[in-house]
UniProtKB/Swiss-Prot annotation:
InterPro entries hit by this protein: EF-Ts_dimer_sf (IPR036402), Transl_elong_EFTs/EF1B (IPR001816), Transl_elong_EFTs/EF1B_dimer (IPR014039), Transl_elong_Ts_CS (IPR018101), UBA-like_sf (IPR009060)
Signal peptide extent: none
Protein name as annotated: Elongation factor Ts
Protein family according to the UniProt entry: Belongs to the EF-Ts family.
């Protein structure tokens, strides 16, 4: 029987299995859908799919640097306990290294590591460890010099926050300090020019409304808005922030004094933007008993 794309999609929808696993299951069972589901179950792959409905908000960010390029990847798990597992950490490290040669997240998932695709490795690990896991995102950065930093490191090159900084000029240690600053201060952008105009305008409108509530003359209000917007921009842009190493300088001034220019950065934190569902113990037990 011909294994069509429609059959593969149907099996993937039923089980959550990866494309290659679904195709292999159908091939092994001559296109018999129910037998293919059973085949996946015996291999632990349908079991992995069943876990995919659970929230994976813990995990690690892994970073890798090579030849003026760097990458950060986020791999999530359901619990911090699994994030401390040596097998999980080895997987994160291998994904980060593989990401250096991948163009985007989809390409990374299809990249082979040790004879298996990244997507297959992840599915296998879900089945063996018994928790839902996701390869959530990757970001790349290139430059004359690229520096990485990991905050709350669980192992070499991975932790709860990963930072990449691209510089021009000779890095004399300032790069690592800037990366540590980014981890702590969480700037929204490199400079005002890189900020989303909608974000700036929204803040401006908020400050206008606040200033007008004061009942002061319009010319005074205008000065208040200018001052408050200047403060806002200094707080959210990397170059405008007070440098944590020396608060008397902005990060931009500190970079200039060190003879470098910051050309870009990436800050990735585990679980940011994921809504973690909290269940009480009784609800969790009831859910388990009800299958």
């Amino acid at each position: 029987m011909a294994i069509t794309a429609a059959l593969v999609k149907e099996l993937r929808d039923k089980t959550g299995a990866g494309m290659m696993d679904a195709k292999k299951a159908l091939t092994e069972t001559d296109g018999d859908m129910e037998a293919a589901v059973d085949w996946l179950r015996t291999k632990g792959l349908a079991k992995a799919a069943k876990k995919s409905g659970r929230t994976a908000a813990e995990g690690l960010v892994g970073v890798a640097v090579a030849d003026g390029a760097a990458v950060a990847v986020e791999v999530n798990s359901e619990t911090d306990f699994v994030a401390k597992n040596a097998e999980f950490q080895a997987m994160v490290a291998s994904f980060a290294e593989a990401a250096l040669s991948a163009s985007d997240l989809d390409a990374l998932k299809g990249t082979e590591v040790g004879g298996k695709t990244v997507e297959t490795i992840l599915t296998d690990k879900i089945a063996t460890i018994g928790e839902n896991m996701t390869l959530r995102r990757m970001e790349k950065l290139s430059g004359e010099t690229v520096v990485s930093y990991v905050h709350n490191a669980a192992a070499d090159g991975m932790g709860k926050i990963g930072v990449l900084v691209a510089l021009t000029g000779a890095d004399n240690g300032i790069g690592k300090q800037i990366a540590m600053h980014i981890a702590a201060a969480n700037p929204a952008s490199l400079s005002e020019a890189d900020l989303d105009p909608a974000v700036v305008e929204k803040e401006r409108q908020v400050q206008i409304d606040i200033a007008r509530e004061s009942g002061k003359p319009e010319q005074v209000i205008e000065k208040m808005i200018v001052g408050r917007m200047k403060k806002f921009l200094s707080e959210v842009t990397l170059l405008g922030q007070a440098f944590v190493v020396n608060p008397d300088l902005t990060v931009g001034d500190a970079a200039k004094e060190a003879g470098v220019e910051i050309t870009g950065f990436v800050r990735m934190e585990v679980g940011e933007g994921i809504e973690k569902v909290e269940e009480d113990f009784a609800a969790e037990v009831a859910k388990t008993m009800n299958g």
